[in-house]
Amino acid sequence: MKKIYLMLLPFLAAACGQGGQQAAVQTDEPVNVMTFNVRYDNPEDSLNNWNYRKERVAKAIRFYDADIVGTQEVLHNQLVDLQQRLPEYESIGVGREDGKEAGEYSALWYRKDRFTAKDNGWFWLSETPEVAGSKGWDGACERIATWAILQDKLTGKECFVLNTHLDHVGVAARREGVKLVLDKVQELGGDLPVIVTGDFNAEPESDVIKQVTDPADPEHLTDARTVAKLVYGPDWSFHDFGSIPYEHRSRIDYIFVKNGLEVLKYGILAETEGDAYLSDHTPVLVSVK
């Protein structure tokens, strides 16, 4: 029996070595990040109403295996609907009108089996960012940003994630909102790898996005699309449930990165089921490491 055990030792050692290598590979798994304006629950949307879309929205998030999701325009009932359908995700955020449940959330979601939230919070895009429900500059609406420091359970490494939705009317609100976001990313995220998701209501050549990505600014971010090794899908993300002609559609939904994150893949997921859309925006997905 002792001889048999000694003969098996090399094979056991090899098997354990392979297991160790496999574990090392697993800890190097990319992180899939999605930004998704899900369109607020508007009864006037007819067949595009949330009641007809909520199952498909949840399935899309799960199908694309998103580890982190930044959502915009989520009303409280929509938050509850998604929480019920995506129990493997934790959500962070509050309603922008009162800091509780009123108004749209810019909710952050993360997979509970992949990440732990070490810290999180939110602030308003206004001159008084800590005042709940405050409206900034010339903005038409209250605007909020939600952030978290997430620790990867596979590696122990941390990253800073922020999700927001800039104003659709106020020029100054977008400009000053971006300044505030960049300052907060630096203040809260420091030297951590940074991911910023959101609907910026601005096209890539706009002053707003140039402000975000200006390399002369030490706080600048990088548009993930511009550095991805593989880019997939159209160059637009807003289509208004398909009503905008292709040549007039625009890319206003972004994922930005900073501090050494490598963007492996970037995709705009312009899918439909027949004539049915997930939202009036497309989800955007990146894979980073």
Feature annotation, model-predicted:
Residues 70-72, 94, 195-199, 223-226:
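Active-site neighborhood of phospho(di)ester-bond hydrolases with catalytic His/Asp-centered motifs
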Residues 30-42, 119-123, 157-166:
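Active-site-proximal beta-strand elements of phosphoester/diester hydrolases
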Residues 15-85, 98-104, 179, 289:
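N-terminal, active-site-proximal structural segment of metallo-dependent hydrolase catalytic domains
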Residues 172, 176, 183-194, 202-289:
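Metal-dependent phosphoester-hydrolase catalytic domains
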Residues 4-13:
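Sec-dependent N-terminal signal peptides
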Residues 39, 75, 165-167, 200-201, ...:
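Catalytic metal-binding/acid-base residues of hydrolase active sites
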